[in-house]
């Protein structure tokens, strides 16, 4: 039998000779990859910030089929340099001022590397106790940094979970609110449930409402006004709720925002939560961008009122040096999530889960499988500490104040909405356009300004519309951005505005 077994083993070895995790080769290739990325960051600001390629460019230059034989890492990286990088919009460029930041850091990258290297699938405590327990710890750490109420922490009966994005956080809490309500009013009343927000709330809520089965007619995006700086008005909220109650509907869920996408305005949480609690709504506070700033004492005021909310989330991958994806969600009542999202098939049953003394994060999210996200957040918190993280945020706020001052010095421009954090909303104002005071024409020249500077590749900015006004958003938050990049960006904007305004004047 021994000789037969040996022959079988030799045959299997010859059939499966590949070892894709040989430690020394992993070490060699890992060094190559780190060198490649270090070189990329050394020269990232030399690339056009926004990719200049045309749709379909990559299919034209890559083979039609996968290679039959192996290729070396060196060959693959050469193609990354010549074929992939030209098609990347460089979010880590110091000249990237569009959307909101996706700030990276050495600690964040290394934590991500370790997480990927371990490659654990932490759906419950048993399959990776450290993954679960570290997530318990870092969400409590972060919650304390934000001075969240103890009821949001594991130590106070609540708890935190790391989701992928705010979209997931909102969906999970909306589903939990829906099911909690329907258990009280009956499952056949789903068509009566109403969701409330402002017209400035992130579109993630509308998508979540669709997925959760909320009737589109029952989605209330309450209009905001320039006079209120585009904040959700508590009186308008209460009027909408009363109207729905009079029509036999069931108010369900309110999403308030700390730092809206369009202008970073902050909804009045104390007054809104007071209204919502009067009518038994679930209140979620979305602080995806601005929440990170609230670790600074001078910004903590914007979270006042969160003590009356049911859930709160922010994206550490935006402005907290933690790589995508890492959305921190805290809930006051974890059982509401668990009742809606738990699954317990036979193949997942285990002694630890049955004790009810451990957290099984699969029951706090939509998916079953989950990554070891806590490692990178732990690395960031330990590598930089609360003090340096506060200074990182304050540095960007200071640069935004400086940029706001530059805009104010040029009489052709105006700031359109108050700057609260590190984003400035501005435009070429009507008085700069001789003979063209029509708002549509003013909007058009601002649209052209945005396209012109983005096409140049020197900087990248994005836009929004506030009260019918086309606005350029200048969001500072890149890890590599300094005051010199901000000054240079303003010069680019001025130069392109000069050309456009001269052209408009000549046309007249």
From Swiss-Prot:
Keywords: Decarboxylase, Lyase, Pyridoxal phosphate. One of its GO terms (cellular component) is cytoplasm. It holds the Pfam family Pyridoxal_deC. Its cofactor is pyridoxal 5'-phosphate. It catalyses: L-tyrosine + H(+) = tyramine + CO2. Its EC number is 4.1.1.25. PANTHER family: GROUP II PYRIDOXAL-5-PHOSPHATE DECARBOXYLASE (PTHR11999), TYROSINE DECARBOXYLASE (PTHR11999:SF96). Belongs to the group II decarboxylase family. This is Tyrosine decarboxylase 4. It comes from Petroselinum crispum (Parsley). The gene is TYRDC-4.
């Amino acid at each position: 039998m021994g000789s037969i077994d040996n022959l079988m083993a030799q045959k299997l070895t010859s059939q499966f000779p590949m070892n894709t995790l040989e430690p020394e080769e992993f070490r060699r290739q890992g060094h190559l990859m780190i060198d490649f990325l270090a070189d990329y960051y050394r020269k990232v600001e030399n690339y056009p910030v926004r990719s200049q390629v045309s749709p379909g460019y990559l299919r034209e230059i890559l083979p039609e089929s996968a290679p039959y034989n192996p290729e070396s890492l060196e060959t693959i990286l050469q193609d990354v340099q010549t074929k992939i990088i030209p098609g990347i919009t460089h979010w880590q460029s110091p000249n990237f001022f569009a959307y909101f930041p996706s700030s990276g850091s050495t600690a964040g990258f290394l934590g991500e590397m370790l997480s990927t290297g371990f490659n654990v699938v932490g759906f419950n405590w048993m399959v990776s106790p450290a993954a679960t327990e570290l997530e318990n710890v870092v969400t409590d750490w972060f919650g304390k940094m934000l001075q969240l109420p103890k009821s949001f922490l594991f130590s106070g009966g609540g708890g935190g979970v790391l989701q992928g994005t705010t979209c997931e956080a909102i969906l999970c809490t909306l589903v939990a609110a829906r099911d909690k309500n329907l258990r009280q009013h009956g499952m056949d009343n789903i068509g009566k449930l109403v969701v409330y927000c402002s017209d400035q709330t992130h579109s993630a809520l509308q998508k979540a409402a669709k997925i959760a089965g909320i009737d589109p007619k029952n989605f209330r995006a309450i209009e905001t006004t320039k006079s209120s700086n585009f904040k959700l008005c508590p009186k308008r909220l209460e009027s909408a709720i009363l109207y729905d109650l009079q029509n036999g509907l069931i108010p369900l869920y309110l999403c308030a925002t700390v730092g809206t996408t369009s202008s970073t305005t902050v909804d009045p949480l104390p007054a809104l939560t007071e209204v919502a609690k009067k009518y038994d709504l679930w209140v979620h506070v979305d602080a995806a961008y601005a929440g990170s700033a609230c670790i600074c004492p001078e910004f903590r005021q914007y979270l006042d009122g969160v003590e009356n909310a049911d859930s709160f989330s922010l994206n550490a991958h935006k402005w907290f040096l933690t790589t995508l994806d890492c959305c921190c969600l805290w809930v006051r009542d974890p059982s509401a999530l668990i009742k809606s999202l738990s699954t317990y098939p036979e193949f997942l049953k285990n002694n630890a889960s049955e004790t009810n003394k451990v957290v099984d994060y699969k029951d706090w999210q939509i998916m079953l499988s989950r990554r070891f996200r806590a490692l990178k957040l732990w690395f960031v918190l330990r590598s930089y500490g609360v003090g340096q993280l506060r200074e990182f945020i304050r540095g960007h706020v200071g640069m935004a104040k400086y940029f706001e001052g530059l805009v104010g010095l040029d009489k052709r421009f105006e700031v359109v909405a108050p700057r609260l954090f590190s984003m400035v909303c501005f435009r070429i104002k009507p008085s700069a356009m001789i003979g063209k005071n029509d708002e549509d024409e003013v909007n058009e020249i601002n649209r052209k300004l945005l396209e012109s500077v983005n096409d140049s590749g020197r900087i990248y900015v994005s836009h929004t519309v506030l009260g019918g006004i086309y606005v350029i958003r200048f969001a500072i938050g890149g890890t590599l951005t300094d005051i010199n990049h901000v000054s240079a960006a303003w010069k680019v904007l001025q130069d392109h505005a000069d050309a456009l305004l001269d052209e408009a004047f000549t046309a007249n």
